[in-house]
């Protein structure tokens, strides 16, 4: 085997390893799914939410999803209360983005956020978490700022 062939074979092996490594990252482990409830003036509704509690999972969010069932969602846990802003880059479906204070009270709701938009959507206050649900669902439920979200990450939740 010539030096050229050996280098070429080594390069191809390295390229294959890199490709397989990146392919593995695209299929990261599924997020933990937990129950969450929203409490409005008209009642309580339960959701099964994926919990995004790492930087990587929060960055990925619901990007590239083609659908979201009415009883599903994603809860972004920031662990530390903070101002937050979201965008819809690479998000294919409209979402209701619900910003939630540390005590579980809803601070603000961005209704039917526009898919693929890179315009920042600010929280309008300090939040511990953000809930994303199917666009239009918050209106169906009669969900408003001041209503409550019950989940283990919120005080009293």
Model features per residue range: what roles?
Residues 22-30:
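Bacterial Sec-dependent signal peptides at the C-terminal "C-region" and cleavage site
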């Amino acid at each position: 085997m010539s030096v050229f062939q050996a280098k070429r074979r080594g390069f191809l092996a390295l390229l294959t390893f890199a490709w397989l490594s990146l392919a593995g990252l695209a299929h990261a482990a599924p997020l933990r799914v937990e129950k969450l409830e929203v409490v409005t003036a008209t009642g309580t509704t339960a959701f099964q939410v994926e919990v995004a509690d790492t930087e990587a999972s929060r960055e990925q969010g619901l990007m590239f999803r083609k659908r979201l069932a009415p009883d599903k969602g994603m809860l972004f846990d920031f662990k530390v209360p903070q101002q937050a802003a979201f965008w819809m880059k690479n998000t294919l479906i409209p979402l209701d983005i619900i910003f939630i204070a540390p005590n579980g009270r809803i601070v603000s709701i961005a209704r039917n956020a526009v898919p693929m938009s890179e315009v920042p959507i600010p929280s309008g206050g300090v939040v511990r978490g953000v809930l994303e649900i199917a666009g239009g669902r918050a209106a169906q439920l009669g969900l408003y700022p001041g209503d409550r979200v019950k989940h283990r990450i919120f005080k009293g939740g």
